[in-house]
Curated annotation (Swiss-Prot):
PANTHER family: CHORISMATE SYNTHASE. InterPro entries: Chorismate_synth (IPR000453), Chorismate_synth_AroC_sf (IPR035904), Chorismate_synthase_CS (IPR020541). Pfam families: Chorismate_synt. Homotetramer. It is an enzyme of class 4 (lyase). The gene is aroC. This is Chorismate synthase. FMN binds at residues 125-127, 238-239, 278, 293-297, 319. It comes from Burkholderia vietnamiensis (strain G4 / LMG 22486). One of its GO terms (molecular function) is chorismate synthase activity. One of its GO terms (biological process) is chorismate biosynthetic process. The lineage of its organism: Bacteria, Pseudomonadati, Pseudomonadota, Betaproteobacteria, Burkholderiales.
Length: 366
């Protein structure tokens, strides 16, 4: 398995399995001289960790992070930063019924056909449990971006199943377990999830992520375009089946006279492009949306096959999120931050001294 590293100059390599002794990552390329403590990282991990409400998996993991290297006397040294998170609440017996069968919608079948072996306990390496190290690495990236460039990366849930969540204010996001930017709709979301859980079923979600303060110039055309790398990173999150940058698929129905964001001396008029033109950041907010499929692990009996190719009926009895999208917001934020810090360093390496006579215009003319 050779696809475990994200990034070019700021790289993150994750390791571990859902029911192994520990999970973690190695961050390479972090600039030296930034203050960093375990508390800085823990604050982000606590936003993602399981067991925080009745609407998510009841697996109780503290997700306490340990910094093993790369930090001396509270400051990054420029050497690899190793983060370790120990697994403490594995319950592998819940997966005894799928040792010889494949769960529909999961990576069981494809991992088996590719590698000839699979860790059936909670999905092993393919588990969303492995997003915890991504959030840990994302905390490092967020801190550097904020302190060096004033970049803020924020996310929220914009839809749960067929329920749209209208945006009200960012302050609402941290006040509810759904990361909803609208406190008034939370009771409806809770009732929806309670009914879903009783049915033994699951549902998908849409998450919006915004990076503000990104300067013009980040991105490496043509194959490492900023939006291309964002899309790749987002699609690397478990259960993500779609990514939009800016207007996304709505662009299909928009005329060029509407979609093309005009430029004025006072700034851009609109941001249909999502803060990226030609694969390079414009200086506007970078806006991303992801579509997350329904959780495949449900209690409803479903048809499948055994390793021998025979018909089978599969029921999943482990502790699972009825909607993985509920905890996806900090994961999506982290992925965006990791792409941005990588491109910030790449831009600095080649074009950090480039200056033009054209003034940098505001992200919005209003």
């Amino acid at each position: 398995m050779s696809g475990n590293t994200l990034g070019t100059l700021f790289t993150v390599t994750t390791f571990g399995e859902s029911h192994g002794p520990a999970i973690g990552c190695v961050i390479d390329g972090c600039p030296p001289g930034m203050s960093l403590t375990e508390a800085d990282i823990q604050a982000e991990l606590d936003r993602r960790k399981p067991g925080t409400s009745r609407h998510v998996t009841q697996r109780q993991e503290a997700d306490e992070v340990e910094i093993l290297s790369g930090v001396f006397e509270g400051v990054t040294t420029g050497t690899p930063i190793a983060l370790l998170i120990r697994n403490t609440d594995q319950r592998s017996k819940d997966y005894g019924n799928i040792v010889e069968t494949f769960r529909p919608g999961h990576a069981d079948y494809t991992y088996w056909q590719k590698y000839g072996i699979r860790d059936y306990r909670g999905g092993g390496r393919s588990s969303a449990r492995l997003t915890a190290p991504i959030v840990g690495a994302g905390a490092v990236a967020k801190k550097w971006l904020r302190e060096r460039f004033g970049v803020e990366v924020r996310g929220c849930m914009s839809a749960l199943g067929e329920i749209d969540v209208p945006f009200v204010d960012w302050s609402h996001v941290r006040e509810n377990p759904f990361f909803a930017p609208n406190a008034a709709i939370v009771p409806e979301l809770e009732a929806y999830m309670d009914a879903l859980r009783k049915d033994g079923d699951s549902i998908g979600a849409r998450i919006d992520v915004v990076a503000s303060g990104v300067p013009v110039g980040w991105g490496e055309p043509v194959f490492d375009r900023l939006d291309a790398d964002i899309a790749k990173a987002m699609m690397s999150i478990n259960a993500v089946k779609g990514v939009e940058i800016g207007a996304g698929f709505a662009s299909v129905a928009e005329r060029g006279s509407v979609h093309g964001d005009e430029l004025t001396p006072a700034g851009f008029v609109g941001n249909h492009a999502g803060g990226v033109l030609g694969g390079i950041s414009t200086g506007q907010d970078v806006t991303v949306s992801i579509a997350i499929k329904p959780t495949s692990s449900i209690r409803t009996p479903r048809r499948s096959i055994t390793k021998a190719g025979e018909e089978a009926i599969v029921e999943t009895f482990g502790r699972h999120d009825p909607c993985v999208g509920i905890r996806a917001t900090p994961i999506a934020e982290s992925m965006l931050a990791l792409v941005l810090i990588d491109h910030a360093l790449r831009h600095r390496a080649q074009c950090g001294d480039v200056e033009t006579s054209t003034p940098k215009i505001a992200g919005s003319a209003t």
